[in-house]
UniProtKB/Swiss-Prot annotation:
The lineage of its organism: Eukaryota, Sar, Stramenopiles, Oomycota, Saprolegniales. Belongs to the tubulin family. This is Tubulin beta chain. Tubulin is the major constituent of microtubules, a cylinder consisting of laterally associated linear protofilaments composed of alpha- and beta-tubulin heterodimers. Microtubules grow by the addition of GTP-tubulin dimers to the microtubule end, where a stabilizing cap forms. Below the cap, tubulin dimers are in GDP-bound state, owing to GTPase activity of alpha-tubulin. InterPro entries: Beta-tubulin_BS, Beta_tubulin, Tub_FtsZ_C, Tubulin, Tubulin/FtsZ-like_C, Tubulin/FtsZ_2-layer-sand-dom, Tubulin/FtsZ_GTPase_sf, Tubulin_C. One of its GO terms (cellular component) is cytoplasm. PANTHER family: TUBULIN. Residues 427-444 have a biased composition (Acidic residues). The keyword ATP-binding does not apply.
Length: 444
């Protein structure tokens, strides 16, 4: 079976990860002790993708890492804390203190070997490992610094396996730490090179969804994580239940036209708050309409400001595949200016019969839009403002980093922005000119 190994790192990654396991355990009928109480064979058919079965109990293929014990203790004390394999909790005692260098070079580097041992052990218990998924944030120290260190180590050891990350990016207005722009830029520098698919999430977009759409007056991180997990559950549906787009590789092949442009926006419809049930069933056209809506995007970049290179939509529930295909065509024809014309039929749709808990139908959207450059631009501006004055740099250089590394990360991020811009402006006619430029770049 095509297994995925899930890794969660840092405070944010562990909280999202813990919630993700609650959601999919619920969907697969696995209770907090790991025994199965489901009602459908479909729940078990591909349960091996995420769970290891031993003597009738299902254990998540999850690895939890952090540089301080706090978050892990709360995961362990949480509703599904007993589900995880105790050896798979790997933690230090010092913490990274929101410092990327501590996570990547000093504290994290000391712990990384014990994490890799657990990764190897999980990978060996798989029949046919298809890849890794990592939940982490880019603004802190552990998830970003140690997370990217782990990604590059796994890349060395398993070069042909897909590496998919769910990365919580810094938000424009909601900032947790002052040095977020540094940590995020250094992380993106790594993710461009070492990850295959990066799903960009960000707290501000999630807060907006909570305020505007769900009308929650004071949303908590729990509510944000609920939204993230709804989307993660939707993206992984295809891997966990029978469907057409059934591997992470197929997803990557359909979504990534150029190797560096693998940062995706995620949308979900219908948006519901925790514990509320959907009172009226939505139709396929309504779902399609909603998932392309900028308000449904879980990342603070507006797709109307760019063009989609590619997109994938995963519908869940009982509906006609024909209707889904018609709607997809419809979207492309009506909004053709928002799709690049040099990739014909660039939306991939797939349908899975099993809806998420409490909904009749839902849909998850992954878009590779050039508008994602807004997010990188924003971080880059904040980065430059601080870096020009060398603010806070001593925390990083004190851990043995070099200023060169900051400069490289900055220029890599700016290159990424201009690549997105280049393809946004490209038309089908001038393709010839592009190829020559590309070849020139290759030669240089």
């Amino acid at each position: 079976m095509r297994e995925l190994v899930h890794i969660q790192g840092g405070q944010c990654g562990n909280q999202i990860g813990a919630k993700f396991w609650e959601v999919i355990s619920d969907e697969h009928g696995v209770d907090p002790t790991g025994s199965y109480h489901g009602d459908s064979d479909l729940q078990l058919e591909r349960i091996n993708v995420y769970y290891n079965e031993a003597t009738g109990t299902y254990v998540p293929r999850a690895i939890l890492m952090d540089l301080e014990p706090g978050t892990m203790d709360s995961v362990r004390a949480g509703p599904y804390g007993q589900l995880f394999r105790p050896d798979n909790f790997v933690f230090g005692q010092t913490g990274a203190g929101n410092n990327w260098a501590k996570g990547h070079y000093t504290e994290g580097a000391e712990l990384i070997d014990s994490v890799l041992d657990v990764v190897r052990k999980e990978a060996e218990s798989c029949d046919c490992l298809q890849g890794f998924q990592i939940t982490h944030s880019l603004g802190g120290g552990t998830g970003s610094g140690m997370g990217t260190l782990l990604i590059s180590k796994i890349r060395e050891e398993y070069p042909d396996r897909i590496m998919c990350t769910y990365s919580v990016c810094p938000s424009p207005k909601v900032s947790d730490t002052v040095v977020e722009p540094y940590n995020a830029t250094l992380s993106v520098h790594q993710l461009v090179e070492n990850a295959d698919e990066v799903m960009c999430l960000d707290n501000e977009a999630l807060y907006d969804i909570c305020f505007r759409t769900l009308k929650l007056t004071n949303p908590t991180y729990g509510d944000l994580n609920h939204l993230v997990c709804a989307a993660m559950s939707g993206i992984t549906t295809l891997l966990r239940f029978p469907g057409q787009l059934n591997s992470v590789l197929k997803l990557a092949v359909n979504l990534i036209p150029f190797p560096r442009l693998h940062f995706f926006m995620i949308g979900f419809a219908p948006l519901t708050s925790r514990g509320s049930q959907q009172y009226r069933a939505l139709t396929v056209p309504e779902l399609t309409q909603q998932q392309f809506d900028a308000k449904n995007m879980m990342c603070a970049a507006d797709p109307r400001h760019g063009r989609y290179l590619t997109a994938a939509c995963m519908f869940r529930g009982r509906m006609s595949t024909k209707e889904v295909d018609e709607q997809m065509l419809n979207v492309q024809n009506k909004n053709s200016s928002y799709f690049v014309e040099w990739i014909p039929n660039n939306i991939k749709a797939s349908v899975c019969d099993i809806p998420p808990k409490g909904l009749k139908m839902s849909t998850t959207f992954i878009g590779n839009s050039t508008a994602i450059q807004e997010m990188f631009k924003r971080v880059s501006e904040q980065f430059t403002a601080m870096f020009r004055r060398k603010a806070f740099l001593h925390w990083y250089t004190g851990e043995g980093m070099d200023e060169m590394e900051f400069t490289e990360a900055e220029s890599n991020m700016n290159d990424l922005v201009s690549e997105y811009q280049q393809y946004q402006d490209a038309t089908a006619e001038e393709e010839g000119e592009f190829d020559e430029d590309e070849e020139m770049d290759e030669m240089m």
